[in-house]
Amino acid sequence: MTNATPTPVIVTGAAGKMGREVIKAVVQADDLRLYAAVDRNPDVFSLDAGELVGLDTLNIELTNELEPVLAAAAQEKQPCVMVDFTHPSSVYSNIRSAIAYGVFPVIGTTGLSDEQMNDLTEFTEKASMGCLVIPNFSIGMVLLQQAAVQASQYFDHVEIIELHHNQKADAPSGTAVKTAQLLGDLGKTYNPALVEEKEHLAGARGSLGSENIRIHSIRLPGLIAHQEVLFGAPGQLYTLRHDTSDRACYMPGVLLSIRKVTQLQTLSYGLEKIL
């Protein structure tokens, strides 16, 4: 369905791999329009956003200043959405700034702390504005997480392995943390100790979350984004795995989030909340 007035979209982290995919997806969507592209990389300043992603000229130059973009977007008649794929060090302030200007954030950047998430939830509720924080925009990953929740009814032992490219700044991944949280929300105690473990190298057994589920993080060139959830029981191993071969797989989830976030009045975490 094509809206009479397309929703304006700001892309932050526009020169990154995900940012470029978002620009292409937004430009190709009839009900959306690229409003601005923001990135701190000095090599792309003043470059046209279309040229950046291999499309025709869009007459939208990349800028490194988010605040003036948000201020201008606040004057638009149509609600504006900001899609953020930046860095854990800047995403929190980006969200607060967007909400302050009445721009709806869709966040793909991971690394927000629990304290920051609680603060942002309170901030969005006071503003009665929607904000989506999505650790993984892949429909396939949501299905994996749902399958893991079902499997947890029958297995008491589970560990998670997440594998990403070596330019990912945070570990463990937000997707792995989210998966562990979904399993922990069931109120089950996982991985009862059978022996007293001793690590000869710190961290050899991975990170241990409050759900008592260990998460192992791997960072290598050649990887994009992959996750395994391994359930073990006497005589059997049940493995769930999701592999990303192209970042285009995230775009249906990104576009859905852009279209849904303006209908919300508080922060929501996870793609499954809007499916």
UniProtKB/Swiss-Prot annotation:
Chain positions recorded as NAD(+) binding sites: G13, A14, A15, G16, K17, M18, G108, T109, T110
E.C. numbers: 1.17.1.8
Keyword Cytoplasm set for record: yes
Main location per the UniProt record: cytoplasm
Classification via InterPro entries: DapB_C, DapB_N, DapB_N_CS, DHDPR_bac, NAD(P)-bd_dom_sf
Catalytic activity of the protein: (S)-2,3,4,5-tetrahydrodipicolinate + NAD(+) + H2O = (2S,4S)-4-hydroxy-2,3,4,5-tetrahydrodipicolinate + NADH + H(+); (S)-2,3,4,5-tetrahydrodipicolinate + NADP(+) + H2O = (2S,4S)-4-hydroxy-2,3,4,5-tetrahydrodipicolinate + NADPH + H(+)
Gene Ontology CC entries for this record: cytosol
Active site, renumbered: H164 (proton donor/acceptor), K168 (proton donor)
Amino-acid positions noted as binding (S)-2,3,4,5-tetrahydrodipicolinate in the UniProt annotation, renumbered to this chain: H165, G174, T175
Location in the cell: Cytoplasm
CDD domains with a match to the protein in the record: DHDPR_N
GO biological process, one term: lysine biosynthetic process via diaminopimelate
Keyword annotations from UniProtKB, A to Z: Amino-acid biosynthesis, Cytoplasm, Diaminopimelate biosynthesis, Lysine biosynthesis, NAD, NADP, Oxidoreductase
Membrane-spanning segments: none
Keyword Ligase among UniProt keywords: no
A GO term, aspect molecular function: NAD binding
Signal peptide range in chain numbering: none
Pathway note: Amino-acid biosynthesis; L-lysine biosynthesis via DAP pathway; (S)-tetrahydrodipicolinate from L-aspartate: step 4/4
Pfam assignment, any one: DapB_N
Enzyme class, first EC level, given as a word: oxidoreductase
Function: Catalyzes the conversion of 4-hydroxy-tetrahydrodipicolinate (HTPA) to tetrahydrodipicolinate.
Family, as annotated: Belongs to the DapB family.
Protein name as it appears in the record: 4-hydroxy-tetrahydrodipicolinate reductase
Species this protein is from: Acaryochloris marina (strain MBIC 11017)
Primary gene name: dapB
